[in-house]
């Protein structure tokens, strides 16, 4: 239920509201003994018997007239307080006169005084005129300053007369229609405090309805007893309007209204108005609730600000995402275009490559013809003619212009040896050309034959010296063998031969003319037999040993050789080998043959080794018999004195 009350009570200049208000309230007596339960009291709103004709006082009567104050467009604003203000409508002194004795005020007013001027609160309501009820009013509590002014207020019985004492006219507010009190509506207590400048109201969500009063008079109707609590802050903190005026809404900011039941007791016997004691209530609870409400409002404001900021950030984030999406889409389109262009270029390159890979038939035919012409030039008749012409030229080779120390055969043998030398020289001259011209290229076959391995430079003088010594060694063995054979055949012939040797003692070598012999004496002594026979007789043996014309051969069928291995080996050079064989001294006067053995040492490098299988039929007959004897001697008994112990067969280069 809403309680109408006025925020401001104007006063006339020069009047002491405090003195007049509490002076009149001091006459109320017998208020301490009267208690009434407002919950069990019924009120009747019968305004037909009420007299609202007021004898208004001359001070500012036009301001408080209903025509000037209560209008549809009124706007209530908190203003600085006068020495006295009121939050409820109070009837004028004349209105109490016009009303019957049944009028009563079912409210309890708590007046809290301070060092400043207090606020006045009056409220009355009209009841049924059938019975006269005494008016019950509250006894104001004066502050410390008022106690010194008034002192003890005497209790006076208020006579229900038609002419009460004159009091200052308070502000009249139209009363709202009274509704029966419900148990669910809490009681309210209105606490009035004196303020220095403004009268702020406590923060509550209660609405005060103000309606225009009738023309004849003004009646204030409070739905429930209430005590208005006014706080001391000079500024009215407000967040929501609480004052509603009919016709035009004028609201006062937040206030706190605590309603407590205020019983009113009607005393028909003595006709006195019983006024209850004022209820004193501290403002600490309202202050705490105000702080809580203020904090709640601050939290609401912060929440709204944070929500606004979050919405703003979200909007900015969405705008950024949209911009990035647009940039990504544009970049994607650009990349698609570039990808398409690259694919087209790749297709063009692939097609061009395929066209270039397929050769035309004309080019293929030309290539085949060039290859055939090259083959014909290398293996054709022109190359053969050049080779034939070259075969005739080797006769001029310097290999044929060498000195022959001994010649034992006739002219035919010389021609045969010359032909063999020509063939061998041609073969090596063809493989390794002696031409040193810079711009002349030797003709080689199409199939490349790798040249022989690199050989160190050979001194020509040293080569000739070695060749001369080897040939002399072979021929000396031949001379010794021939001499021993003739001595066995005929002593006479031996003497002649020895005489001839003595005559030619000045020469170291001597040429011996001999004829072919079909058989050789098997009783020959220890000697080196040089084999001179016709090429056709022992051609099979030469083929078996793969004889080469530029190589000296030492053939032995004995098994009792002294072989000494090498103690060191150099991997970067060819293996070296020395052959030590019996030799004949050039001059018997140089070394005595009785105390020393004359041997020939041949140092050479091993070029190759291989195993040969020679047929026994190809071996010369005289070597075959020696082979049998030496084999049996090597595996059996030692040889006899009559058997040959050292037989070496030497095959010279010049004879085949």
UniProtKB/Swiss-Prot annotation:
Residues 455-575 are annotated as: Interaction with THBS4. One of its GO terms (cellular component) is Golgi apparatus. The record marks 406-407 as: Cleavage. It comes from Rattus norvegicus. Residues 293-356 form the bZIP domain. This is Cyclic AMP-dependent transcription factor ATF-6 alpha. There is a cross-link at residue 75 (Glycyl lysine isopeptide (Lys-Gly) (interchain with G-Cter in SUMO2)). Interacts with XBP1 isoform 2; the interaction occurs in a ER stress-dependent manner. Interacts with LACC1. One of its GO terms (molecular function) is sequence-specific DNA binding. It is a single-pass type II membrane protein. There is a cross-link at residue 139 (Glycyl lysine isopeptide (Lys-Gly) (interchain with G-Cter in ubiquitin)). The gene is Atf6. Pfam families: bZIP_1 (PF00170). SUPFAM superfamilies: Leucine zipper domain.
């Amino acid at each position: 239920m809403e309680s109408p009350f006025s925020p401001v009570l104007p006063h006339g200049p020069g009047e002491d509201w405090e003195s007049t208000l509490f002076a009149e309230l001091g006459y109320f007596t017998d208020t301490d003994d009267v208690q009434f339960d407002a919950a069990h009291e019924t009120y009747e709103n019968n305004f037909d018997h009420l007299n609202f004709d007021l004898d208004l006082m001359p001070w500012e009567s036009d301001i408080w007239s209903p025509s000037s104050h209560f209008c549809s467009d009124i706007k209530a604003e908190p203003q600085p307080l006068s020495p006295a203000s009121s939050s409820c409508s109070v009837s004028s002194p004349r209105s109490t006169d016009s009303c019957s004795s049944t009028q009563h005020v079912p409210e309890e007013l708590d007046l809290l005084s301070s060092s400043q001027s207090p606020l006045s609160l009056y409220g009355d309501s009209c009841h049924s005129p059938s019975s006269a009820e005494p008016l019950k009013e509250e006894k104001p509590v004066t502050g410390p300053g008022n106690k010194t002014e008034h002192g003890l207020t005497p209790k006076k019985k208020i006579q229900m007369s038609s002419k009460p004492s004159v009091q200052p006219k308070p502000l009249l507010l139209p009363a709202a229609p009274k509704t029966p009190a419900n148990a669910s509506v809490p009681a309210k207590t209105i606490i009035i405090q004196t303020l220095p400048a403004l009268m702020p109201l406590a923060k509550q969500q209660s609405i005060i309805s103000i309606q225009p009063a009738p023309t004849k008079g003004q009646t204030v109707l409070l739905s429930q007893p209430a005590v208005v609590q006014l706080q001391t802050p000079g500024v009215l903190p407000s967040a929501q309007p609480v004052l509603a005026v009919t016709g035009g809404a004028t609201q006062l900011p937040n206030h706190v209204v605590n309603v407590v039941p205020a019983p009113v007791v009607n005393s028909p016997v003595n006709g006195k108005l019983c006024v209850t004691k004022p209820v004193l209530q501290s403002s600490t609870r309202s202050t705490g609730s105000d702080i809580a409400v203020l904090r709640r409002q601050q939290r609401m404001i912060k929440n709204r600000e944070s929500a606004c900021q979050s919405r703003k950030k979200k909007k900015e984030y969405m705008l950024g995402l949209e911009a990035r999406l647009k940039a990504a889409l544009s970049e994607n389109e650009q990349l698609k275009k570039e990808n398409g262009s690259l694919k087209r270029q790749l297709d063009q390159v692939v097609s061009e490559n395929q066209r270039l890979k397929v050769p035309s038939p004309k080019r293929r035919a030309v290539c085949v013809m060039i290859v055939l012409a090259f083959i014909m030039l290398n293996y054709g008749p022109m190359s053969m003619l050049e080779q034939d012409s070259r075969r005739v030229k080797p006769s001029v080779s310097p290999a044929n212009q060498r000195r022959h120390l001994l010649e034992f055969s006739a002219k035919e043998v010389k021609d045969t040896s010359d032909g063999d030398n020509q063939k061998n020289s041609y073969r090596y001259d063809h493989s390794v050309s002696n031409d040193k011209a810079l711009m002349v290229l030797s003709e080689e076959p199409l199939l490349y034959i790798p040249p022989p391995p690199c050989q160190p430079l050979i001194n020509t003088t040293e080569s000739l010296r070695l060749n001369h010594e080897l040939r002399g060694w072979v021929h000396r063995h031949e001379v010794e063998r021939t001499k021993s054979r003739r001595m066995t055949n005929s002593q006479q012939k031996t003497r002649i031969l020895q005489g001839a040797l003595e005559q030619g003692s000045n020469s170291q070598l001597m040429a011996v003319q001999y004829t072919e012999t079909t058989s050789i004496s098997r009783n020959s002594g220890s000697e080196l037999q040089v084999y001179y026979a016709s090429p056709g007789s022992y051609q099979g043996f030469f083929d078996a040993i793969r004889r080469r014309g530029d190589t000296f051969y030492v053939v032995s069928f004995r098994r009792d050789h002294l072989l000494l291995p090498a103690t060191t080996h150099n991997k970067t050079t060819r293996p070296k080998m020395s052959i030590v064989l019996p030799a004949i001294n050039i001059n018997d006067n140089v070394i005595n043959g009785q105390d020393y053995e004359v041997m020939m040492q041949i140092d050479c490098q091993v070029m190759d080794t291989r195993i040969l299988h020679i047929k026994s039929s190809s071996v010369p007959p005289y070597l075959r018999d020696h082979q049998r004897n030496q084999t049996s001697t090597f595996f059996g008994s030692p040889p006899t004195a009559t058997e040959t112990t050292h037989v070496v067969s030497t095959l010279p280069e010049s004879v085949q």
